[in-house]
């Protein structure tokens, strides 16, 4: 011990010169000693825990016993390992996604920040524009706005009135697509001498025609038996409006085939002229510019006349098979037109089942006819003087007696129909000759470029001369036909 002290004293100057390095080495040695102690403590702790686990009671059911009992121990272990592997993979994927999202957030460049700022500006501008538009739609009414929209809504800046004006203006935006293109679908009616007493609106599809498709022939359209007679006969009593349930591009050609020279049908309307409401297209009779007291509609779809069901005569859709339902409708429609009816709606309402209207009308007519015959018989029996002279008229119009009024109306209607059809045939022939003569009277693009087009006055003179030639040719052919007969 003394020798060590002496050695330290003798070497003190040398150690003092290296004091800093010795101090550092001592600190490092101390830290290494502390770390080694910690490791020894943790190892001893784990060894103690392992001994405790070994001392725990083990299960009696070993793997050998379970295997002898028929239980597959290895499969259960494999499944457990597989599930553990899947959960570990899921955790790894979730951690990778979270880390990637964090990296994306950290990777925002100046361009991304600029885009985000512009997007915020856009949202602010859009919201402020919508708010300004909403306030503008709450303003007081202007003079040029629709009167129907102003109805029952006054000016003022109370919350209730502002909301009502906003709602009315907002709904008017959508009514542009729901309403017909014009407020009045038909022009004003002609003056009294040329005006028909009633307006009859009839549908085209499954009433006058029926279209069907098959693989062999494609689309085919059949015309209902009696359709030409139905239109021609009733055209002398009614202003007939053909209101198709299909779009114009599909139904216009069929409508033209039904009446090529527009002699029977006054106007054609299509699906574009319907009102779209509650998901269906409705044929609104109030848009026809006609008095609803004088309008009737015949249709096969209940939705078509749901706004005016009291003006409707419902019919079952025609399936393309031959029938006589069109002809059976004529007597009732003729009666309505010839009786100078003030309002058609109460008369239509008096029928219990409108779909069987022709049959019910025939029953009523038969009752009236029986009563009329009985009255005529009583009159003839009371006139004993004519009986003595042998001049008593025969009942029911045979031999010059009085006729039933509806029979007389029908006979007169048949005569007018024959005369009218004769005029139509002559007009068709005249139109055919006119088309043949006018087909060669055309002007080419060369005539337009060179200025060889006649003036409007010269064109009018040419048309008048051509019309005279057509009339003379038509009269000549007419005389030839009469001579051949």
From Swiss-Prot:
Membrane topology: Single-pass membrane protein
Residue intervals of the FCP1 homology domain: 193-336
Keywords: Membrane, Mitochondrion, Mitochondrion inner membrane, Protein transport, Transit peptide, Translocation, Transmembrane, Transmembrane helix, Transport
Keyword Mitochondrion recorded: yes
InterPro entries, A to Z: FCP1_dom (IPR004274), HAD-like_sf (IPR036412), HAD_sf (IPR023214), TIM50 (IPR050365)
SUPFAM superfamilies (UniProt xref): HAD-like
Residues annotated as transit peptide in the record: 1-35
Stated role: Essential component of the TIM23 complex, a complex that mediates the translocation of transit peptide-containing proteins across the mitochondrial inner membrane. Required to direct preproteins in transit and direct them to the channel protein TIM23, and possibly facilitates transfer of the translocating proteins from the TOM complex to the TIM23 complex.
Name listed for the protein in its UniProt record: Mitochondrial import inner membrane translocase subunit TIM50
Record organism: Candida glabrata (strain ATCC 2001 / BCRC 20586 / JCM 3761 / NBRC 0622 / NRRL Y-65 / CBS 138)
Lineage of source species: Eukaryota, Fungi, Dikarya, Ascomycota, Saccharomycotina
């Amino acid at each position: 011990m003394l020798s060590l002290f002496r050695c330290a004293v003798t070497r003190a100057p040398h150690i003092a010169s290296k004091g800093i390095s010795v101090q550092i080495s001592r600190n490092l040695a101390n830290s290494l000693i502390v770390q080694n102690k910690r490791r020894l403590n943790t190892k001893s702790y784990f060894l103690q825990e392992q001994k405790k686990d070994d001392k725990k009671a083990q299960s009696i059911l070993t793997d050998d016993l379970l295997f002898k009992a028929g239980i597959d121990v290895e499969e259960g272990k494999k499944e457990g390992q597989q599930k553990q592997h899947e959960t570990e993979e899921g955790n790894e994927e979730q951690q990778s996604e979270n880390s990637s999202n964090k990296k994306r957030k950290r990777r925002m460049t100046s361009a991304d920040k600029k885009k985000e700022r512009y997007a915020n500006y856009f949202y602010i501008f859009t919201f402020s524009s919508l708010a300004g538009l909403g306030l503008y739609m709450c303003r007081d009414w202007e003079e040029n706005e629709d009167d129907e929209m102003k109805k029952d809504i006054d000016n003022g800046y109370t919350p209730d009135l502002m909301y009502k004006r906003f709602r009315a203006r907002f709904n008017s935006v959508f009514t542009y697509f729901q309403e017909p293109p014009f407020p009045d679908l038909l022009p004003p009616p002609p003056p009294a001498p040329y005006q028909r007493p009633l307006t009859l609106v009839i549908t085209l599809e499954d009433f006058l025609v029926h279209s069907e498709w098959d693989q062999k022939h494609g689309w085919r359209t059949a015309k209902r038996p009696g359709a030409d007679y139905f239109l021609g006969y009733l055209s002398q009593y009614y202003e007939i409006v053909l209101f198709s349930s299909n779009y114009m591009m599909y139904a216009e050609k069929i409508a033209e085939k039904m009446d090529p020279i527009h002699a029977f049908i006054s106007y054609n309307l299509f699906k574009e002229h319907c009102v779209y409401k509650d998901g269906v297209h409705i044929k609104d009779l109030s848009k026809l510019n006609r008095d609803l007291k004088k309008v009737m509609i015949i249709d096969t779809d209940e939705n078509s006349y749901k706004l005016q069901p009291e003006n409707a005569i419902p019919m079952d859709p025609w399936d393309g098979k031959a029938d006589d339902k069109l002809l059976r409708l004529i007597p009732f429609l003729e009666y309505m037109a010839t009786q100078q009816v003030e309002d058609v709606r109460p008369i239509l309402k008096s029928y219990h089942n409108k779909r069987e209207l022709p049959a019910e009308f025939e029953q009523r007519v038969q009752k009236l006819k029986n009563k009329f015959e009985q009255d005529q018989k009583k009159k003839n029996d009371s006139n004993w003087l004519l009986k003595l002279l042998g001049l008593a008229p025969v009942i029911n119009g045979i031999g010059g007696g009085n006729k039933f009024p509806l029979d007389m109306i029908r006979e007169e209607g048949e005569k007018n129909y024959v005369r009218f059809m004769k005029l139509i045939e002559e007009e068709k022939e005249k139109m055919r000759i006119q088309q043949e003569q006018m087909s060669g009277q055309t002007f080419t693009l060369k005539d337009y470029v060179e200025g060889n087009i006649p003036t409007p006055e010269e064109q009018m003179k040419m048309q008048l001369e051509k019309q005279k030639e057509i009339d003379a040719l038509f009269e000549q052919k007419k005389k030839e036909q009469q001579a051949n007969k």
